[in-house]
Structure formats: structure tokens, C-alpha cells
UniProtKB/Swiss-Prot annotation:
Disulfide bonds: none annotated. Pfam families: Myosin_head, Myosin_TH1. ATP binds at residues 102-109. This is Unconventional myosin-Ig. It is a peripheral membrane protein. Residues 699-728 form the IQ domain. Interacts with calmodulin; via its IQ motifs. GO terms for biological process: actin filament organization; actin filament-based movement; endocytosis; Fc-gamma receptor signaling pathway involved in phagocytosis; T cell mediated immunity; T cell migration. GO terms for cellular component: actin cytoskeleton; cytoplasm; microvillus; myosin complex; phagocytic cup; plasma membrane. GO terms for molecular function: actin filament binding; ATP binding; calmodulin binding; microfilament motor activity; phosphatidylinositol-3,4,5-trisphosphate binding; phosphatidylinositol-3,4-bisphosphate binding; phosphatidylinositol-4,5-bisphosphate binding. InterPro entries: Kinesin_motor_dom_sf (IPR036961), Myosin_head_motor_dom-like (IPR001609), Myosin_TH1 (IPR010926), MYSc_Myo1 (IPR036072), P-loop_NTPase (IPR027417).
Length: 1007
């Protein structure tokens, strides 16, 4: 927190100075710089000193310290300002902007990058992919734009040679959804010429010193900037491999932004073409120019996607259309050809830079943004524009740059100083007027219609006849000589710092600047022969061709005179200032501590001069006498009314002013506020922070209240919908049910008299609600129909019917035949026809057993063939009563050989073929395997009868009996596991058991 900074660091806010004088201001600035405190506040303005060294002030931990904090809660920092602009945008849904100003080399570009870094770090907590794409594009765009738009100057190693304003769009949650970059006045003359100690744009050196050897070979380039006219001036490549690292960083950034490999290759070819174009030299051949080295054309043609002949024609001549539409080809002199070559190189680089900016904008623009879905879109603008420049030789570019800085200073004065004081007067707030320097006369000197320097420059460019730069200067001397901020050698003959017919001086807010008028007219006209435009429009390279849409015009087409460079720049700056004025501004005022780029040297005079012309002292005085925050009463209440019981949810007082006064007095802030006619003014940010804290505590409660009310309304509405839907559904269901039942009655009303009792009738398709009803009805109908059929069966046959039903349930679909179609006798051994000669002995044996164990009934009896303990087949008989299973010896008066309680039988196994094999599984693991034998007629199917009889008996005794159907039966004989299979043998007369490797095989006679 700022109050935790000890007195040894000075005042963290210049507003807290004991005395507001230049001496005290400079003393505090010097002290903080010497202690490594490069940021200091003036209220909500950040004064930033360029440290000229890396500082550990921008890592993730520092970001977390400033996230969501108020300005005064942490030491001064760019992050605090960025967070304040972000919070203001979110809280009030109002567009904000951050204006970064200062002279060249003061650290504006670095400040803009740190602000972008902070905004990217605190947004998109849910890591949405689209938001991450936009953030990465915004961050990486800086790297690309610096490479193509920045250069080393004598004052700054990474000087922005263009102006940049970036709009970042946010959704209602505060996540970035897109952005747009505006660029202003690229210093394209730097492509041709640089002052001693300076360099061309970084992009050329990065390509020459960082590209792989194979790429350089394909572009016909040498790894030597001194080999090319456009890069051999001034100083050369940076030490330490900075250009090589920059090349790799730019390639990576372009890939992240979305440049395709083809587009990157086209950019590299265009840069190489500019370098080669600069090496094209001309010689006189009679009255016209000729190429010094014709072989260069082949390389240029390859790089630009044109032909050598087309290039030669465009470089050495131009086509002029007469008034009658006749075309005349006019050859260039060597001087004219060199001028055309340089104009073409400048224009190509300018169009390339504009195309790159447009390509970045296409990548970061908001996609699919729907206001109804995402809410209102708000914007944070970040302005990083060239600083005030005073060089040894100042030309047209410095004139435009300094004019831009005058306009921004005018905006600062208008918003911070003039409007601030005017608002206090308008609102009736007691106020002590603060004097300040107004640069409005300087701005008017430059841009005033018909009388300003820009108007006179355009007038000279449009004049008929030969007009030179010296004539333009003479016209300015005549028209502007009386202006207090303008002078020249002619007006001040004793001032030998200026040359006659060359120099003029403007007393800017930041100091006096002497401009050389040489080249003003030419740079303002920005002439480029139409032949070059047509040449590049017809290029085979789609990227290069897209940069020259104006080359499509016919040679004879009459077009309007294009606006001059100065007019275009003025219009763009006026639009920029209007855009900034519509937003809530936040300022970063960058100060350059020295010209030696030293991290320890504090140049008192240089810093004092910057503080003076930036108006920082006046800014302190205005804030000391004024208020940090103001808001119309209705908007103030709208935001904070929930913090006071008398204003929530709506006040009953006469005016909003009374309600605001009541709210602030309840919190005890009456001594820190003033009440205007339409607005409330709050002096310190701490008061506002306290209100915000209380509001933040109450918002969740209000949200819950609103959620409860809204959810209740939604639930009630949904309930009404449901009731209506259920009513409709109920009526419709009743209609469908009624129709179904009527149709069902109609179809089945005569079913009792039908021969099949309705078996052949089709049931109507039921509605979904009656599907279960139909299933139950069909089941009841089947039972009713079965009862109708069964009631005609004699009671004596019912036992047989039940047994057959039980057998069908166990064997139907599993065994080919189970004797359903014949009558079941059960006790076959008591039949004289089935058991001739032995029926009587069997009857005696049955009677003896009945007398002994008193069983109730004989369930089944039959001759069988079985396996004995010696694994031999033997003829036996079985008798099954309701209590026991008996194995009998027929040849010995049916003597009982084995008696097995029926309760010991756990299951039966039969085969799927016609073999009459039955295995009785027992609890004691001594199973009985028999084959029904000696049936009359021969081969009669009785397995199904045996199964059905036993199942029906178990059903009546409520005991479960498992029935298995398989052609490979597992059984246990005296505790040992055996496998029993069946084979059909045509040559076997009677069934017979044989031993096999795994157990036994039953050979069944074939048919």
C-alpha cells in the first residue's frame, strides 16, 4: 500500500506534496527515481520515468497484488491504472481509454505493452478458447508491429515510427472479445534515408541477420546490411544477436496471429524486393535513363511476381494520357528514374505495413458477437503514439509528429484543466482558478483552415507552375510572420541557427523546433507514378496484388485529385481526438530522465523541461483544489442506493440531491463531498472505495433476492404452462382412450360365439398411455379364452392337461417331440397290452409297496435300460410314486433294487433328439441314468410325459425341479463326474449304453 512506502521514498502522489512548486515537484521526482520508484501518481495520472534497465515489477505475483485493488491501496504502478480503467469500464459500462504520452525515448511503447499484459492476465478466468485466441492475438501483435514500424534513432533504440491506437472490445463479463488497431503516419521516408547513428526499420535487419541461409539464398540476399543502399546508412545490425532473436519472435508471433506460411513468405519476398530495388542504379543514355545492371531485373521480377520487361518499362518511363485520350510514353532522366524508384520503395513498404495491420485486425476482430446474448460491448482504448521529437534535422515527418502531440496536449488541457474548472463553475462549486498554458494558438497555427501551415502547404502543392520549397517558405513568412509562435531566418535575420530559404521555427508547447522545409512539398504530394501501381496490381503474387487495388484503374480514367499526406494525417488525428474525447480517459505521462540512456543519471534540466511542457504542475494544482470523482445524482443513487435504508429500493424525498445527501451523511462522508446543481463531487478516492466496499457486500444479498423473485416468477409461469399442457393432454388422452375402448368393444363384442373365441382377431393400436393396459387385457383375454376351452374338458382329463402344460413349459422349442399329441397313460407297467405276462406281478409289487409306505398314487412306470456298477447295460423298470422313485428288477417279480425318496431328486436332464434318455439328478451325487425301453408301439415318445408328470407333482407340492435339455449331459455316479452323450446307429436294434473315454454313450436305434 502507498502508505507503507516510507518517507525515504518520497511522496507516492504528487498531490500530497507539502508545497506545490516546481522545486518540490522535481525533488520528489529525483528522490523516487534514485530509489527505483519509477511510477508516481498525480491523482489518477501515472507519471512514469524510463528506468533504462529491466525491473522485477511485472511478473505474475505483481499482477495478483494489483488485481481488483483501488489505486491508493498499492504503490503507484501501470497495473493500478490499467485495473482502474478496467474496473470503470465494467462498473459503469462506459468506454475508457489510456493515453500514453511523452517525448521519443520516454518509454511509451514499453508502457503500452505492460498495460496490455496486465489486461490479458486478469481476464478470462474460465479459459474460454475464443477469448484466449483474442488475447494471444492482441499480445503478439505488438511484436509484429514493432518489427515493421519501429526503428533505432539517436534518442531511442526501439522508437515507434508510426502512431498506434488499439481498441479492445469486452463483453458484459469483462472478457476481451476482439480488438482493432489504427495506425497513423508511418515514417516511410526512413526506408530511403536515415540520419547518422540511426537505422532503417527493424524488419530489414531481422531478415538479413536472422533468416536461415537457405531462405536468404532463395531471396538472393547477403547476410550483410552494408550491401544494400537502404540499410548501409547510419548504424548497422544490433549487437548480441537481437535481430536474429527478433526474427524468430516475429515468425512465431505471425503464426500465433494466424498468418499462413504463404503470407509470411510473401512478406519476406516484399522486404527482399525493396532491398534489391534500392540497389538499382541508373545511367544517362542520351537524354533518357538506362539501367546500370540489367541482370538485377530478373531477381526483382521473381520476387515481385512480374516480368523483367514490365519492371524495366515502369522504372525507365511513364505513360501519360492527353486530354484527347491519346497515350504518350515519356522516358525518365536518371534523376527522375531514381525518384520514381525511391517513391515506389516507400509506397511498397507503406502498403505492406497497412496490409499487416489489416491482417492482424482480421484475426483479432470480434466474431459472432450478439448483443442479446453477450450484452453491451464496451471498449478500452490504448494510445501509443510517437512522442515529441527534436532532431538535428527536422523534416516533414517531425512536423506531423509534433502536430499530433500538440493535439493530444490540447486534449489533455481540455479534459483535465479547462473542462475540470469549467465544470466546477457550471455546478456552482467554490473554486480557486488555476492558471495554465494553453497551446490552442499553436494548434491553430498548424491546422487553421485557409491560414494554417497545413492549408498553405496544400495550396503550394496544388498551385500551377513551378513551386519550390523555398517559395512555400516565403509564402509562410508573408502570411504567418505576425504569429507569436512562428519565426524564420527572414523574420529574424540575426538568428544564425536558421538558414535563409530553408528553415522555419515553431514555438511548440514542448520547446522550439527548427524545421527544414526541404522535401515538404514532395512528401506532402506523395507522388507515385500510376505505372508502378498497374505493375504491382498485375503481379502474380496474390498478397502483393491485394495491396494495390488502385492499379486497376484505366490509364485514361479521370480521377479526383487525391488528398495530400498532411491533410490525410490531420483528418485521422482529428478523428482520433474525437474518439478519445468520447471515452473516459486515463493518462500515463512518460518522462525521459536523460539523453544518455543511463539508469542512474537524472538530468535536472531535461526533466524540468518535460514536467513544464506536460503541464504536470498545473495538473497537481487542479487536483489539490478539486475533486477526484463526480457523478450525476441519479446515476450515483442508481449505483449506491442499496447502502442506505432511506434510499433503498427507491427514495421518497423531493429530489435526488436530498437523497444523495442523506446517503452520504448516514455514512459520515459529509465533510468529503460537495453538492453541485446536477452532480455530487467527492474529494478523495477513499470515500468512493468505502462506498464500493459496502456495495460489494450487499450485492450478493440483492442478487439472491432478485434470483428468488425471478425464479419464483419463472416457476409460476412454468406451472401455468404445465397446468395448461396437462389440461390439454388430459382431454386428448380421454379422447384417445374413449376411441380405443369403443373400437375394442366393437371388435370383440361377438367373440363368445366365434369358433376360436377371438384368437384370429387383431387388437387395435392402443395410445401410449394404454400400452400396459392392453398387455394386461391381452393376458386376461388369453386366460378367459383358455377357460372357455378348458371348461369343456372332462375333469378326469385335467391332470393330463396340467402335466402337458408343465412339459410344454420346460421342453417346447428345445426338444423335437415330447408326446403332446397322444394320451398319457403314466402307469404303463400295469397295462396288460404294454406289459404282457408281467402286469400282474407288477400289480402285486405296487400293492405291497402301498401297504408298506402308504403312497398315494403311481405317477409313472416303465421298462428302462440302465448302466450298472460294472458299466454294463441292464434291463430294469422304474416306478415313480408321489413319495419315491423305485428301480425294479422285472425278472424277479419286480423286486426293489433301489429306493430313492422323490424329495432327493433335484433335477432332470433330457436330450433334444428322439432318444428316450432321462437322467435323475440327486442330492447325494449318485444320479440315475435310464433309457425308456420296450414301449408299445415301438419308439413311442414318453420322455415329455415323464417330465410333465414330475413337474406337475412338484408344482402341487410347491417344490422346484430343474429340467435341462442338452445332448451332452453331465452326471455323477457314486460321486464321480461322467459325461453322457447320444449317438444314433441305424444297425442297433435296441438302445444300449457303452463306455467311452469321458463316460458313456447311448447308442439309439436309427429310423
Amino acid at each position: 500500500m502507498t502508505e507503507l512506502e516510507g518517507p525515504e521514498f518520497g511522496k507516492a502522489d504528487f498531490v500530497l506534496l507539502d508545497e506545490v512548486t516546481m522545486e518540490h515537484f522535481m525533488e520528489n521526482l529525483r528522490l523516487r527515481f534514485s530509489k527505483g520508484r519509477i511510477y508516481t501518481y498525480i491523482g489518477e495520472v501515472v507519471v512514469a520515468m524510463n528506468p533504462y534497465q529491466p525491473l522485477e515489477l511485472y511478473g505474475p505475483s505483481v499482477v495478483e497484488q494489483y488485481r481488483g485493488r483501488e489505486l491508493y491501496e498499492r504503490p503507484p504502478h501501470l497495473f493500478a491504472l490499467a485495473d482502474a480503467a478496467y474496473k470503470a469500464m465494467k462498473r459503469r459500462a462506459k468506454d475508457t481509454c489510456i493515453v500514453i504520452s511523452g517525448e521519443s525515448g520516454a518509454g511509451k511503447t514499453e508502457a503500452s505493452k505492460y498495460i496490455m499484459q496486465y489486461i490479458a492476465a486478469i481476464t478470462n478466468p474460465t479459459q474460454r478458447a475464443e477469448v484466449e485466441r483474442v488475447k494471444n492475438g492482441l499480445l503478439k501483435s505488438n511484436c509484429v508491429l514493432e518489427a515493421f514500424g519501429n526503428a533505432k534513432t539517436n534518442r531511442n533504440d526501439n522508437s515507434s515510427r508510426f502512431g498506434k491506437y488499439m481498441d479492445i472490445n469486452f463483453d458484459f463479463k469483462g472478457d476481451p472479445t476482439g480488438g482493432h488497431i489504427y495506425n497513423y503516419l508511418l515514417e516511410k521516408s526512413r526506408v530511403l534515408q536515415q540520419q547518422p547513428g540511426e537505422r532503417n526499420f527493424h524488419s530489414f535487419y531481422q531478415l538479413l541477420l536472422g533468416a536461415p541461409d537457405a531462405l536468404l539464398a532463395s531471396l538472393h540476399l547477403q547476410r550483410d546490411p552494408t550491401a544494400y543502399c537502404y540499410t548501409q546508412q547510419g548504424t548497422q545490425g544490433s549487437a548480441g544477436g537481437d535481430d536474429a532473436r527478433g526474427y524468430r519472435a516475429v515468425e512465431e508471433a505471425m503464426a500465433v496471429i494466424g498468418f499462413t506460411p504463404e503470407e509470411v513468405g510473401a512478406v519476406q519476398r516484399i522486404l527482399a524486393a525493396i532491398l534489391h530495388l534500392g540497389n538499382v542504379q541508373f545511367v544517362a543514355e542520351g537524354e533518357v535513363a538506362a539501367l546500370e545492371a540489367v541482370e538485377q531485373l530478373a531477381v526483382l521480377a521473381q520476387l515481385t511476381g512480374t516480368t523483367p520487361e514490365q519492371l524495366r518499362q515502369a522504372l525507365l518511363a511513364r505513360t501519360v494520357a492527353t486530354g484527347g485520350g491519346e497515350l504518350i510514353e515519356k522516358g525518365h532522366s536518371p534523376t527522375e528514374a531514381a525518384y520514381g524508384r525511391d517513391a515506389c520503395a516507400k509506397a511498397i513498404y507503406e502498403r505492406l505495413f497497412g496490409w499487416i495491420v489489416g491482417r492482424i485486425n482480421a484475426s483479432i476482430t470480434a466474431r459472432g458477437y450478439d448483443v442479446r446474448q453477450h450484452g453491451k460491448s464496451t471498449v478500452i482504448g490504448v494510445l501509443d503514439i510517437y512522442g515529441f521529437e527534436i532532431f538535428d534535422t527536422n523534416s516533414f515527418e517531425q512536423f506531423c509528429i509534433n502536430y499530433c502531440n500538440e493535439k493530444l496536449q490540447q486534449l489533455f488541457i481540455e479534459l483535465i484543466l479547462r473542462q475540470e474548472q469549467a465544470e466546477y463553475q457550471r455546478e456552482g462549486i467554490t473554486w480557486q482558478n488555476i492558471e495554465y498554458f494553453s497551446n490552442e494558438p499553436i494548434v491553430e497555427l498548424v491546422e487553421q483552415p485557409h491560414r494554417g501551415i497545413l492549408a498553405l502547404l496544400d495550396e503550394a502543392c496544388l498551385a500551377v507552375g513551378t513551386v519550390t520549397d523555398a517559395l512555400f517558405l516565403a509564402n509562410m513568412d508573408a502570411r504567418l510572420g505576425h504569429h507569436p509562435h512562428y519565426s524564420s531566418r527572414k523574420l529574424c535575420p540575426t538568428d544564425k541557427t536558421m538558414e535563409f530559404d530553408r528553415d522555419f521555427r515553431i514555438k511548440h508547447y514542448a520547446g522550439d523546433v527548427t524545421y527544414s522545409v526541404e522535401g515538404f512539398l514532395d512528401k506532402n504530394k506523395d507522388t507515385l507514378f500510376q505505372d508502378f501501381k498497374r505493375l504491382l496490381y498485375n503481379s502474380m503474387d496474390p498478397v502483393l496484388r491485394a495491396m494495390w487495388p488502385d492499379g486497376e484503374q484505366s490509364i485514361t480514367e479521370v480521377t479526383k485529385r487525391p488528398l495530400t499526406a498532411a491533410t490525410l494525417f490531420k483528418n485521422s488525428i482529428v478523428a482520433l481526438v474525437e474518439n478519445l474525447a468520447s471515452k473516459e480517459p486515463y493518462y500515463v505521462r512518460c518522462i525521459k530522465p536523460n539523453d544518455q540512456k543511463s539508469p542512474v543519471l537524472f538530468d535536472e534540466e531535461r526533466c524540468r523541461h518535460q514536467v513544464a511542457y506536460l503541464g504536470l504542475l498545473e495538473n497537481v494544482r487542479v487536483l489539490r483544489a478539486g475533486f477526484a470523482y463526480r457523478q450525476p445524482y441519479d446515476r450515483f443513487l442508481q449505483r449506491y442506493k442499496m447502502t442506505c435504508e432511506y434510499t433503498w429500493p427507491n427514495h421518497l424525498m423531493a429530489t435526488d440531491r436530498e437523497a444523495t445527501q442523506t446517503l452520504l451523511e448516514q455514512h459520515g462522508f459529509q465533510d468529503d463531498v460537495a453538492y453541485g446543481h446536477t452532480k455530487v463531487f467527492i474529494r478523495t478516492p477513499r470515500t468512493l472505495f468505502c462506498l464500493e466496499q459496502e456495495r460489494a457486500q450487499l450485492i450478493p444479498i440483492i442478487v439472491l433476492l432478485l434470483q428468488k423473485a425471478w425464479r419464483g416468477a419463472l416457476a409460476r409461469r412454468w406451472c401455468r404452462y404445465l397446468r395448461a399442457a396437462y389440461a390439454i393432454m388430459g382431454y386428448y388422452k380421454r379422447h384417445k382412450v374413449k376411441a380405443y375402448l369403443l373400437e375394442l368393444i366393437r371388435r370383440f363384442q361377438g367373440v363368445r360365439s366365434m369358433p376360436d373365441f377371438g384368437k384370429s382377431l387383431a387388437w387395435p393400436e392402443p395410445p401410449a398411455v394404454l400400452s400396459r393396459f392392453q398387455e394386461n387385457s391381452q393376458q386376461l383375454f388369453r386366460r378367459w379364452r383358455a377357460r372357455q376351452i378348458v371348461k369343456n374338458i372332462p375333469p378326469s382329463d385335467m391332470a393330463q392337461i396340467r402335466a402337458k402344460v408343465a412339459a410344454m413349459g420346460a421342453l417346447h422349442g428345445l426338444r423335437k417331440d415330447w408326446g403332446c399329441q397322444r394320451g398319457w397313460v403314466r402307469d404303463y407297467l400295469s397295462s396288460a397290452s404294454e406289459n404282457p405276462g408281467l402286469a400282474l406281478p407288477f400289480a402285486h409289487r405296487v400293492q405291497a409297496l402301498r401297504d408298506k409306505v402308504h403312497f398315494g398314487a403311481v405317477l409313472f412306470s416303465s421298462h428302462v435300460r440302465k448302466i450298472n456298477r460294472f458299466n454294463k447295460s441292464r434291463d430294469r423298470a422304474i416306478l415313480i410314486t408321489d413319495q419315491h422313485l423305485y428301480k425294479l428288477e422285472p425278472r424277479k417279480q419286480y423286486r426293489v433294487m433301489r429306493e430313492l425318496p422323490l424329495s432327493m431328486v433335484t433335477g432332470l436332464s433330457v436330450t433334444s433328439c428322439r432318444a428316450q434318455l432321462v437322467v435323475f439328478h440327486t442330492q447325494n451325487h449318485d444320479d440315475l441314468a435310464v433309457c425308456l425301453h420296450k414301449t408299445q408301439p415301438r419308439g413311442d415318445e414318453r420322455v415329455g410325459e415323464l417330465v410333465g408328470v414330475l413337474l406337475e407333482h412338484c408344482r402341487t407340492t410347491k417344490r422346484e425341479l430343474q429340467v435341462h435339455v442338452s445332448d451332452r449331459i453331465q452326471l455323477s455316479l457314486r460321486g464321480r463326474k461322467r459325461l453322457l452323450t447320444v449317438e444314433t446307429q441305424p444297425d442297433v436294434a435296441a438302445p444300449d449304453f457303452r463306455k467311452s473315454r469321458d463316460g458313456f454313450v447311448l447308442y439309439w436305434p436309427g429310423s
